[in-house]
Amino acid sequence: MVEIAKSNAFVYRIRIGFILVNLSEIITIALKHVPFDGWNEKTFKLACNEANISEVKSKLLFPRGSIDLMLAFISSDNQKMTELIKIDKNHEKKYRDKVTDAIIKRIIIADLNKEAMRKAISALSLPHMFPDNAAMIWNTSDAIWNALDDSSQDINWYTKRTTLAWVYSSTILYWLGDESKDLLKTKEFVNRRIDEVMEFESIKMKFKMSKVGKEFLKGAEKVFSLIKAPTANTNL
């Protein structure tokens, strides 16, 4: 079982130009207010004041105020998850189990601040927040695959992340209503979703090996070969 304790040892930083900024303190302070006030401007101003962050600096760090602070909280938890995944030295695990464990790690981290995450998901569910909601889910999926050293360079880069995004988004919604001990029901839910994905992959493989599938892929593979994974901009 994965155990994650609240600790001051973790430091979440972002880079603005050439300046590395520590956001852990303001996120920690905000989490004291969010359960009562939510991710709003009141929480944002209280957190900035208590962290001694000026109004000018706060607008530089969080242009959209409470929204960007909320997203920084989620990104911080993603980074914690990434570090835990990389610490796991069990290289004998199948990829199925590695992905399952990664999702569970992320949920356990979220469970440390469940009310804050609940309010974040509620805010992200509003229609005008759809782009941020989609980006949040995608970024978590991407963080998991990157932490697992995914080396895909073609269309599989996208399909892996899209599939995992579906599993993660459905899991986190299920977790919000889970009151079981040690998140047992959520863990079972994750395994069921992964089983469904594996069953689909099995069907897809059978189709590829069939006569119809081979004929279809003759043309489709030409298109798929043009799709490449994004590359980092080395000119920055």
Regions found by a protein language model. Name each.
Residues 21-56, 64-71, 75:
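Short, amphipathic alpha-helix enriched in basic
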Residues 95-109, 136, 140-147, 193:
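C-terminal ligand-sensing/allosteric alpha-helical core of TetR-family HTH transcriptional regulators
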Residues 150-166, 170-194, 200-211:
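Hydrophobic/aromatic-rich alpha-helical bundle segments in the mid-to-C-terminal region
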Residues 203-236:
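Long, charge-rich low-complexity segments
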Residues 9-11:
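Short hydrophobic alpha-helical segments enriched in small aliphatic residues
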Residues 85-119:
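Hydrophobic alpha-helical connector segments
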Residues 76-86:
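Conserved phosphoryl-transfer catalytic core
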Residues 128-150, 160-165, 169:
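Amphipathic alpha-helical packing segments from all-alpha helical-bundle domains
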